[in-house]
Amino acid sequence: MIDLSFLTEEEQDAILKVLQRDAALKRAEEERVRHLPEKIKDDQQLKNMSGQWFYEAKAKRHRDKIHGADIIRASMRRKKLPAAAEQNKDTAMRAKESWVNNVNKDAVLPPEIAVVEEPEDDTDPAGPSSSLVDPASSVIDMSQESTRTPAVSLPKQRKNPFNSPKLPEDHSLQQTKPEQSKTGKAGLFQISKEGELSESKEKSSIPDMPRQQLEKPKQTVSTEPENASHTKAPIPKARKLIYKSNDLEKDDNQSFPRQRRDSLNARGAPRGILKRNSSSSSTDSETLRLNYNLDPKSKILSPGLTIHERISEKEFSLEDDSSTSSLEPLKHVRFSAVKNELPQSPRPVLGQEVGEFTVLESDQLQNGTEDAGDIEEFQNHPELSHKTPLSHYQLVSSPSDSGREREQLMSSGSAPRDEIPCHSDILPTGPQCVESSSVINGQQEKSSHFTKLPSELSKSPSDELTQCGEPEPSQTADHSFRDHRQGSEEEHSPVLKTLERRAARKLPSKSLEDIPSDSSNQAKVDNLPEELVRSAEDDQKADQEPDTNECIPGISTVPSLPDNQFSHPDKLKRMSKSVPAFLQDESDDRETDTASESSYQLRRYKKSPSSLTNLSSSSGMTSLSSASGSVMSVYSGDFGNLEVKGSVQFALDYVESLKELHVFVAQCKDLAAADVKKQRSDPYVKTYLLPDKGKMGKKKTLVVKKTLNPVYNEILRYKIERQFLKTQKLNLSVWHRDTFKRNSFLGEVELDLETWDWDSKQNKQLKWYPLKRKTAPVALETENRGEMKLALQYVPEPSPGKKLPTTGEVHIWVKECLDLPLLRGSHLNSFVKCTILPDTSRKSRQKTRAVGKTTNPVFNHTMVYDGFRPEDLMEACVELTVWDHYKLTNQFLGGLRIGFGTGKSYGTEVDWMDSTSEEVALWEKMVNSPNTWVEATLPLRMLLIAKLSK
């Protein structure tokens, strides 16, 4: 609020003229925008010319800002409040400050029109002396004064005649009756008295009021024909989807249609005193700057225009049930099982700005001038405070509805879903219900200072918030009503907080290779189920446990053992099934290769000039038995050591009206068990539109915990034109979510959309598809990946003076690479990694330094591996891979596998023994020429399971 008390009359008139010109310009602009769809057919051009883009950007950047004109209007109206009335406010007065005092007005105008067409008057309608005059005449004078002001321009502060200190309550009531007969304005006085009596029936002022006195004014109101225009309650129009913003300007003094007015006059009296909570966003209490989502074809506003309303919890009438029928058509109920984010008040919602009365109301809240009449009404009628559960639906109603109508419609929440129109962007439910009722709860908290609520009322806000929870998963048949909830719904999930704390915690000096990255985007996309929330504490405990598999920093040469380190076929077979890390794109957007190769930046391997050796194959072989899925290499043609089995049930449909591809994922059955001991997995489904995975993005379902037969019933949506689908393939894969390690592949299904019949009803039905193993990409194998210039040497006896029998060493001299491919435009920062298969332990890996800004990097780096006997050379394979390092991710460029290429290692079939003829020739030459450097330039190739670059 702004203090405008210093303004003179001339200055106020000048400001009002500016506001009037602003309102006229707004009306002209709205008229122009309303006719735009008739001339412009292009959606993007219509969005630009209508100014929709501006309001969207403004809502994002200035969410907490209020329109300047509204602040000025509210400040000028605030100035009109009588100073004496503010000083004499007490608890009983606050119970009567309500919209009910304005029900005898004959017009309902928006605030900006009221300011423009009705000049303000500085005279105080109820001065300090009003409390000393006769109560009846003072009320009549105030009613006459209020008819000369705009209908809802300001909730005037009136002196309650029943609280006059010089007149007893019952005496004042006896005096008012003869005054009615003397004046010709009994209707006005009776309306005012009826509003005050039926609103609260206060115990402090009229404790023993007979019920006949409450009913008598209702009968006399209908007998005054000359005041018929004053007896109509200002019922605002019920909002519909088809809404024109200039209706209010066209109907300046008509607050509702003539048919509605006639029906009210036919009954003789308005339907009781329609109590309106000031927190309800009705058409007469705020300026709506509508977001025009216009459909050029239908020329109507799209469902995105739906106005979010804050629901008043306490709009109840004291009339009988027979009076509810005339207002039944005015009720518009919309249900939605979808969550959208609702900005907290007073933030604008998609172009809707906070009106001037919202500013006034917030100012009254701060000054403690809150209406307490609603709560006292609950005290006198505790049966009205009963709330029927929402039954998984959220209710939206016009602010003029009675409480009994609301109870009837809320109790009908269990109606069949096929009779309820569902919109995906109407009203939020779930946690956002707390925000939508923030004004109501604040009102109850402030009013509790004056009045102690009964148990029913104190219990109702929490009960209603509890009922606002998200709906239960629907059955398979009604999947069209389900919407895939993505975004930041689970921002308050304890698991997400746990992961954020772990990600923010300072890491020790150990390598990033040893730490599986757990802070993933999946937790921000998946709506975590109850099981994952319940297991949050377990995750925290497990996170606090020390990592027993942590590798010891530093490099040392371990003497080799004379046993046959490679003679364990069962271990070898298990290692050949490990997950290829750099292809494992299921690491929750951790686009890394073998367990995040960015650890080379930490210089974990402190190599000294005197010792180029790393841990030998002997030490590597001892760790074979403890190898897990997180120890990965490039060699594996499989995507995990889990058996692929089971099937998935889903259906495809293309919605022309939305231009969206819908993938309805129903359920899976008989999946592989990631937890073999407990025979369970934590599966979820992920989809891609190939070949361009990055453009359309991946979509995921929720993670269903601890089951092999998950039920999802979710719709994954892709915004894509139908003609583009002919060039796409749908890849649907099932994965096991592991909290602390990489996710495991459970199977996939791939459908070619080029030949898909979208008009066939059979294709829209749910079908079971068997899960298959992941296929290796062969399209990139023939690409030119560059070349590597290197030299190999086998040293059979590096230290002949020792007593124990020694083993040989293999020296690998990586000289340079030529013509490496550019995957990031003109940027390249390459390095080489070496592993001797079948040893895949982290301790046995060695890397070169990274050389940037060139496609022909010179490394000149020698790697030494010991522990080799002559027979081991027949079973081993040197794997050299080239990577492009960028920040925390590495992209695979190409690689070599130098060995004999027999397809077997120690009698076990392995997929990494696939050397080309050139690679085999180099390895044979090295074995046959010990203690001699054998040099060659070999072409890099895309290994069998290498990841497609994005």
Swiss-Prot record:
Expression sites (tissue/organ): Highly expressed in brain, lung, kidney, testis and in embryos after day 7. Detected at lower levels in skeletal muscle. Expressed in pancreatic alpha cells. Isoform 6 is highly expressed in brain, but not detectable in the other tissues tested. Isoform 1 is expressed abundantly in the stomach and is predominantly localized at the apical region of gastric-surface mucus cells. Isoform 11 is expressed in cytotoxic T-lymphocytes (CTL).
Entry keyword Metal-binding: no
Compositional bias of kind Basic and acidic residues: 87-97, 193-205, 246-264, 479-502, 531-544
An annotated GO cellular component: melanosome membrane
Result of knocking out the encoding gene: Mice show a reduced number of mucus granules, a deficiency of granule docking with the apical plasma membrane in the gastric-surface mucus cells and reduction of mucus secretion by gastric primary cells.
Processing and modification events after translation: Isoform 1 is highly susceptible to proteolytic degradation and is stabilized by the interaction with RAB27A.
Start and end residues of each stretch annotated as Disordered: 78-98, 116-289, 361-620
GO BP, one annotated term: exocytosis
Domain C2: from-to ranges: 644-769, 784-913
Residue ranges of domain RabBD in the record: 1-57
Keyword Cell membrane: yes
Biased composition (Low complexity): 608-620
Pfam families membership: C2, FYVE_2
CDD domains per record: C2A_SLP-1_2 (cd08393), C2B_SLP_1-2-3-4 (cd04020)
GO molecular function terms listed in the Swiss-Prot or TrEMBL record: neurexin family protein binding; phosphatase binding; small GTPase binding
Biased composition (Polar residues): 140-150, 173-183, 219-230, 434-445, 557-567
Keyword annotations: Cell membrane, Exocytosis, Membrane, Repeat
Record note on domains: The RabBD domain mediates interaction with RAB27A.
Function: Isoform 11 acts as a RAB27A effector protein and plays a role in cytotoxic granule exocytosis in lymphocytes. Required for cytotoxic granule docking at the immunologic synapse. Isoform 1 may play a role in melanosome transport and vesicle trafficking. It controls melanosome distribution in the cell periphery and regulates melanocyte morphology. Isoform 1 acts as a positive mediator of mucus secretion by the surface mucus cells of the stomach.
Assembly behavior: Monomer. Binds NRXN1. Binds RAB27A that has been activated by GTP-binding. Interacts with RAB27B.
PANTHER family recorded: BITESIZE, ISOFORM I, SYNAPTOTAGMIN-LIKE PROTEIN 2
Protein name per UniProt: Synaptotagmin-like protein 2
Organism placement in taxonomy: Eukaryota, Metazoa, Chordata, Craniata, Vertebrata
Name of encoding gene: Sytl2
